[in-house]
Amino acid sequence: EIRPTLMKKQMDKEVDKHEGIGNFYQCLVHAAHQFKIEENGEHYIIAGWPWFKCRARDMLVAMPGLTLNIGENKLFESYMETFAKAMRDFMNNRKLSVNIYEIDKPDVPLWATWCIQQYAKLVSGKECYAKYGTLLNEIMSYVLAGKHPNLFVHDNGLVYSSGHEKAITWMNSTIDGKPIVPRSGYIVEFNALWYNAICYTLKLAGQ
């Protein structure tokens, strides 16, 4: 319920927040902002309306396009700051301090590296490494040490994951809790991301 005398004030407040839409680019910017959620000082990207929450993989895949491509580097940094808390909580076996779901998916740390790579394209490698080098090194050390519960580096250099009992890739449809497409083994996109993560982290550290 709301007091009728407050309705006009609330309406004016919402109108003031409304973005002007005068061309197609502004429409895209407006659409990008619709996925932006802020709670308790943390910044999230919602995976979709009305029922999805902030999911780690979706957040990382979408982050560059929803921020960097429209000139909002600071918003990217805010999103990444929130994500980094979830990633570090997971890697250190702590209860998550932020509301990001599916942080346990095997490709999430690899997408994080790719996401930071997109940021580096708009700033210098030195600046990117100063801001995210520690996080990148923590992620790579975590994976190489075999600490991830479902992302293992085998002797052939490829990463292996098991998806027989639980959907672990973007093909995540299930029936009775079981994956319809139980993708397991040397999953192609996981290994593409893994190769990219190795090459990029070494390149960035070398700069």
For each of these PLM feature ranges, what is it?
Residues 1-207:
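Acidic, mature catalytic/reactive cores of soluble proteins
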